[in-house]
Regions:
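Mid-domain Rossmann-like dinucleotide-binding core that forms the NAD(H)/NADP(H) cofactor-binding site
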Residues: 128, 133-217, 221-222
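Glycine-centered, small-residue-biased loops immediately flanking beta-strands
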Residues: 255-258
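N-terminal Rossmann-like NAD(P) cofactor-binding module of classical short-chain dehydrogenase/reductase
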Residues: 80, 232-235
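C-terminal substrate-binding/catalytic core of Rossmann-like NAD(P)-dependent dehydrogenases/reductases
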Residues: 224, 228, 265-302
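NAD(P)H dinucleotide-binding glycine-rich loop of Rossmann-like/cofactor-binding domains
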Residues: 45-52, 57, 87-169
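Glycine-rich beta-strand-centered segment in the early N-terminal region that forms part
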Residues: 7-23, 38-91, 133-135
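Local beta-strand N-terminus motif with an aromatic residue
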Residues: 76, 163, 208, 229-232
């Protein structure tokens, strides 16, 4: 880490300046700091930042200054910043999917432009500021990353009150938060799979319909029996070769199933292609969430 001193930015136009109260450390920050993601077979996917860029995208702070075109936010109030900011000009941005903006043109805080590991953060528009309600200062910023990631992944499963048909793999911070959101926002109690008994016990306490230890040799049979023939959707918050191997066995003979891949542990995985067609199955990557989904999530938080 290197300390860098800059003049405090002065917002103009639609820009706003936020004084950082707290900024979380995301696991992807570690990958970015390390300079790569694991592509399997010894391959590394580069993730190095430009020199002297300030990291940090889970930002919560106090609004201290605004540009002359800003009118809908309040100086002195605390806000969570939506960090997945696009160029505003490409098709993805114009369709409300700024988080899908090209990495060559995106303006993601802490990834493409200076982020929250600093005293102040300059944000290009007031629309990226969100009231966090009564959320604790040290947790509020995480709603814009892990909270949004979990919420968006859950929406992609298209599950509707089928608690024993949705499996969450990984009972870490993301998985546990997804479990809470599934219960509160979707009225679903997913089953949860992990290799850590302590995490599984916590998941059960928080309302999982059932928990399963992935180290058990008969875990697939256990899940199949509980779910009456296999699940309809899996959200994988680990993203390893081992979890994909396990997760794709959990569907049984069910058709139209969805595998939502979120975790970035890394690796490489091979598929039996005809089974994808015969089973009408979908494997879908899920990357953070849209600005509209952030509005939905923060409405739930408040």
């Amino acid at each position: 880490l290197v300390e860098i001193n800059h003049e405090t930015p002065i917002p103009v136009g639609k820009q706003v300046l936020v004084k950082t109260i707290a900024c979380g450390v995301c696991h992807s920050d570690i990958h970015i700091h390390d300079g790569f993601f694991d592509g399997g077979d010894g391959n590394k996917i580069p993730s190095r930042l430009q020199d002297n860029l300030t990291m940090g995208h889970e930002v919560y702070g106090e609004l201290v200054s605004v540009g002359e075109e800003v009118s809908n936010v309040e100086i002195g109030k605390k806000y969570v910043i939506y960090p997945w900011i696009g160029c505003g000009e490409c098709d993805q941005c114009k369709n409300g999917m700024e988080h899908y903006c090209s990495p060559f043109t995106a303006q993601n805080l802490g990834v493409n432009v200076d982020g929250g590991y600093s005293d102040y953060v300059l944000v290009k528009d007031e629309k990226y500021l969100f009231d966090a309600g009564d959320a604790p200062d040290n947790l509020a910023g995480s709603y814009a990353c892990r909270g949004l990631t979990a919420y968006s992944a859950l929406k992609k499963t298209n599950q509707n009150n089928t608690s024993n048909k949705l499996a969450i793999i990984g009972a870490g911070g993301l998985g546990v938060l997804a479990l809470k959101i599934a219960k509160s926002a979707f009225n679903i109690q997913p089953l949860v799979i992990d290799i850590d008994e302590q995490k599984l016990n916590l998941a059960k306490e928080l309302g999982a319909s059932a928990v399963f230890n992935a180290t058990h040799t008969n875990v697939v049979e256990e899940v199949s029996e509980f779910s009456n023939g296999g699940v309809h959707a899996v959200i994988d918050f680990v993203g390893s070769e081992q979890t994909l191997e396990l997760g794709n066995k959990l569907f049984g003979l069910n058709k139209g199933c969805k595998y939502i891949l979120v975790g970035l542990f890394g690796g490489k995985y091979s598929l039996t292609l005809p089974m994808m067609t015969f089973g009408a199955r979908t494997i879908e990557g899920s990357y953070v969430g849209s600005l509209a989904e952030m509005h939905e999530l923060m409405g739930l938080v408040r």
